[in-house]
Amino acid sequence: MRAAAEHLTPVTLELGGKSPCFVDRTADINVAARRIAWGKFTNAGQTCVAPDYVLATPDVAEALAERIAVAITEFYGEDPKASPDFGRIINDRHFERLCKL
């Protein structure tokens, strides 16, 4: 950033974030579940806004977890491995690299 500032160069910092989701009884559980599942699984979860935490009040937590599971099944079917839409690691080299993280 210092080098960019010295030359008035625009800079964008990707700071990441843990992107928590908070769900309580005022939320539409079905909508929240679909959006959480979509956000996490889009691009195999490799986006800066993919939710990493779901915080839910006790009165909705179980229903939300069930609806997220339903949403994942709706998006990718009963067998995600057979779904062309389910993100994958593309080769053994990348798989090994990720295992070392």
Name the predicted role of every residue range.
Residues 1-101:
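ALDH superfamily catalytic-core signature
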